[in-house]
C-alpha cells in the first residue's frame, strides 16, 4: 500500500528478492528493446496509464538504459485528476528529452455506446478495444504494467512477453521460443511448460512485454518508494485502481467513489445508457436484465 507518512530522507530498503526482480526486469527490457530494433527498427513504446504499475515500468525503462517512447491512450472516461497527473508526468519527461504523447480516440465512449447500442459490461467490453487497446501503426512493440497479482485471470495468461501476430508463423518458434526467453531471464515460472511465452492474436499485429508480470503489490509500492516516487494522488484518497470512471470491471464501491467525485461523468454514463435503452425499445430489441426487458 502507499506510504501516507514517511520522513523525506528515509530510505526504503528492498529485499534481495526484490532487487533480483528489478535486475530481471532490466534484462527483460533490454531483450525486448533489441527485438524491437531488430524487427521494426523502432524503440519500445511504454503504455502509461497513470497508475502505480505504469509508474514502475516507466522508471524501470529509464533505469534499464533502453531507447523508448511513452504514450497514453485517452479514453474520454478518464478521471480528470488522472489526466492532470499524466500531464505533469509527461511535462517532466519532455524536460528529460523523452518522447511522449497522449493519443486521443476517434470516438468517445458515449458515442460508441450510442452508435453500437451496447452498454459496456464484464461480458460486452465494447469500449476496451477501441479506447484502451487500440494499436498505433508506429507502436509495434509495447510495454505494459500487467501483473498476475492483479487478478486470477491474468495469472492464467501465458506471458511475460506476449506476441500478438497477424500470421500463424509468428509464434514462439519464431525467435527460438523458451530457449531465448530463458536466456533473457524472461521465463521465470516454476512450470515453464504450462506457460507459453508468446500468444498469438490474428486481430492485431503487435508484440507486448509485461516486465513486472510476477511482481506483488508490495514489490510495486516498495520499489516506487525506494525511488522517491509518490505516485498518483488518487491512491491517497482511497482509490485502489486507476481506470475509467464507471468501468464495469471495477467493484461497485470503486464506481460509487468515482461517480461521487465526478458527477459530470456520472451524467454522461446515465444519458448514454438511457439513450441505448430507449433506442433499443423503439427498434423492438430491448435490453434484457435478469431475464426481463428493461423498461
Residues of each region from the PLM?
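Nucleotide-activated chemistry modules centered on ATP-dependent adenylation/adenylyltransferase
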Residues: 1-295
Amino acid at each position: 500500500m502507499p506510504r501516507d507518512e514517511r520522513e523525506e530522507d528515509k530510505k526504503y530498503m528492498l529485499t534481495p528478492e526484490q532487487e533480483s526482480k528489478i535486475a530481471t526486469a532490466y534484462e527483460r527490457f533490454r531483450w525486448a528493446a533489441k527485438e524491437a530494433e531488430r524487427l521494426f527498427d523502432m524503440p519500445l513504446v511504454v503504455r502509461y496509464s497513470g497508475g502505480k504499475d505504469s509508474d514502475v515500468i516507466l522508471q524501470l525503462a529509464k533505469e534499464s538504459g533502453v531507447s523508448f517512447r511513452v504514450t497514453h491512450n485517452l479514453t474520454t472516461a478518464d478521471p480528470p485528476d488522472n489526466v492532470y497527473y499524466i500531464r505533469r508526468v509527461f511535462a517532466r519527461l519532455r524536460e528529460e528529452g523523452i518522447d511522449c504523447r497522449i493519443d486521443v480516440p476517434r470516438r468517445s465512449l458515449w458515442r460508441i455506446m450510442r452508435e453500437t447500442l451496447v452498454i459496456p459490461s464484464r461480458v460486452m467490453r465494447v469500449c476496451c478495444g477501441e479506447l484502451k487497446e487500440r494499436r498505433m501503426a508506429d507502436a509495434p512493440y509495447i510495454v505494459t504494467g500487467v501483473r498476475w497479482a492483479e487478478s486470477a485471470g491474468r495469472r492464467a495468461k501465458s506471458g511475460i512477453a506476449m506476441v500478438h501476430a497477424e500470421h500463424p508463423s509468428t509464434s514462439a518458434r519464431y525467435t527460438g521460443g523458451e530457449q531465448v526467453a530463458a536466456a533473457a531471464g524472461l521465463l521465470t515460472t516454476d512450470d515453464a511448460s504450462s506457460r507459453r511465452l508468446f500468444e498469438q492474436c490474428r486481430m492485431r499485429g503487435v508484440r507486448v512485454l509485461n516486465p513486472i508480470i510476477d511482481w506483488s503489490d508490495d514489490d510495486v509500492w516498495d520499489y516506487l518508494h525506494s525511488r522517491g516516487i509518490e505516485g498518483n494522488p488518487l491512491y491517497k484518497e482511497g482509490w485502489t485502481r486507476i481506470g475509467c470512471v464507471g468501468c464495469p470491471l471495477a467493484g461497485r464501491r470503486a464506481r460509487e467513489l468515482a461517480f461521487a467525485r465526478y458527477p459530470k461523468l456520472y451524467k454522461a454514463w446515465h444519458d448514454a445508457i438511457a439513450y441505448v435503452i430507449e433506442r433499443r425499445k423503439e427498434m423492438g430489441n430491448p435490453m434484457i436484465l435478469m431475464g426481463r426487458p428493461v423498461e
